Amino acid sequence: MSVAKPAHKRILLKLSGEALMGDDQFGINHDTIVRMVDEIAEVTRLGVEVAVVIGGGNIFRGVAGGSVGMDRATADYMGMLATVMNALALGDTMNKAGLTARVMSAIAIEQVVEPYVRPKALQYLEEGKVVIFAAGTGNPFFTTDTAAALRGAEIGAEVVLKATKVDGVYTADPKKDPQATRYSKISFDDAMTQNLGIMDATAFALCRDQKLPIKVFSILKHGALKRVVMGQDEGTLVYA
């Protein structure tokens, strides 16, 4: 009996900062981050190369800062620093779990994390290390979703896995409409026409133009990441 092989060799996992909060109102929930790392470890054991882009919304959101009178660029830089904090926590948890993680930042903080250098990131992935990309794109006015699309394209990821609190993309908000159904797959064009809000427009356009598929799934469902990587019917595939 042949062992099933993963559907993807190299993935870019986009984690929101909020996902790290668990049931807390702020910060990083220890049990939640350990569980996420366990799910990622399970995938690396299949031989899949994993890169992660992490948000910072559990600590600070640039958009929120801009809305209360703060200069938007300054607020965005603060948001980038929040992602560095999350990346350090994620990397530390991975290393304690027996994985080898490398945090690479788009803004220079060389005493804390190494700078993002594409050839080095590719080398780490080929060596089986998990690469965590911090500080978004390094530029204000760009979301961490856009960073996920950008880094995914740069490293030649086969798919961007957008981990959310919902198990896919629905015809309507499942919390408000009991008749809402989950799309198993949907094209970029249809998703844009229906304004489904899967990612911000910049990130979405970049994935579409690079023909980089997006898989939306729930990080809260145990084993969902592995099922996605194995190509099973989990979440929603957005394709070109």
From Swiss-Prot:
GO terms for cellular component: cytosol. UMP binds at G56, D76, T137, G138, N139, P140, F141, F142, T143, T144. ATP binds at K14, L15, S16, G17, G57, R61, T164, Y170, D173. GO terms for molecular function: ATP binding; UMP kinase activity. It catalyses: UMP + ATP = UDP + ADP. Gene3D superfamilies: Acetylglutamate kinase-like. The keyword Transcription does not apply. One of its GO terms (biological process) is 'de novo' CTP biosynthetic process. It is an enzyme of class 2 (transferase). Pathway: Pyrimidine metabolism; CTP biosynthesis via de novo pathway; UDP from UMP (UMPK route): step 1/1. Disulfide bonds: none annotated. InterPro entries: AceGlu_kinase-like_sf, Asp/Glu/Uridylate_kinase, Uridylate_kinase, Uridylate_kinase_bac. Its EC number is 2.7.4.22. Its main location: cytoplasm. Inhibited by UTP. It is found in: Cytoplasm. Keywords: ATP-binding, Cytoplasm, Kinase, Nucleotide-binding, Pyrimidine biosynthesis, Transferase. Belongs to the UMP kinase family. Homohexamer. HAMAP family: PyrH_B (MF_01220_B). Catalyzes the reversible phosphorylation of UMP to UDP. This is Uridylate kinase. The gene is pyrH.
